[in-house]
Structures are given as C-alpha cells and as structure tokens.
C-alpha cells in the first residue's frame, strides 16, 4: 500500500498473471509528491496491492537489503505465473555508489516476497570475465501489445547480456 496521503493519479502498463495478481506502474499525487518520487510499481492480488518500488526510495541489493542507491527510472516489468511468482522488472538506480556503468539492473520479488536485485550492468559472470554493459529482456512481442517475454512460470528469466569485450551471451537467471 502507498503511505497515507498520496493518491493514484494515472495508471500505466498493467499486467496480469494466471493467479489473478496484477502489477502496474502508477503516478501519484498529493502532499509530498514531486517529480523525484511520483512513480511507483505496485503488485499483488487486487485486494491487497503493495508498493514494490517507488522513484526516490532505496533500491535493494541481491539479499533484499536496502542500499543507499535509489530508484531513478522504471523501464519495463512483467508478472510471471506459477507458485510464488512475483513481479520482475528492469530499472535504473542512482546515488549510493551507483555509476553510469552499473545503474541498470534486473529486480524481482522472490518466492518469499522479498524484492531483490538479480543482476546489473558492470557485473561480471566470472572473476576475470568482462563486465556486462547491456541487458536486453522483457521486450514486447511484436504485434501483441502488453505481452512480454523473457520469463517462465518456474522462476527463471532469460536475457541477452552484452559484455565490455563486445561478446554476447544468452543467460538464464533464476529468481530465488
């Protein structure tokens, strides 16, 4: 739920899964709302929606612990079906040690309900491996508005990673 005070102003990009849960972006209005915190990503059963992420709020790390970095832009989101499935989204953060090289990341709500970062640009898959420079996923299926791909009902996300040495790899990232 959003804190007392702000109200929904505009809704964007609602998605629905087979369990009847929803996820959507919404712009907020009311006391204390400004450009830096006006957009939030909400999700859950319609009767018990919760705020998953909001511009200006602290973004979590891989363990789900809040960091000094804050959400700065939401790029795309999806809502897989299946037991324990939660929202998956691509977003940018800023501040708290975030740089232009590591601001883009993939976040997901895990089977226990914890929001955590799964992967971000400038991560390496091996100790001496090249850094990831680009993540491509959650793109719309051509001609099917509101239909994304890159995820399944068993907690896996597929993505295309581009590395600093210009190589690419198809990766499967499992949501814990």
Which residues make up each language-model segment?
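Conserved "turn/edge" positions that cap or connect secondary-structure elements
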Residues: 1-176
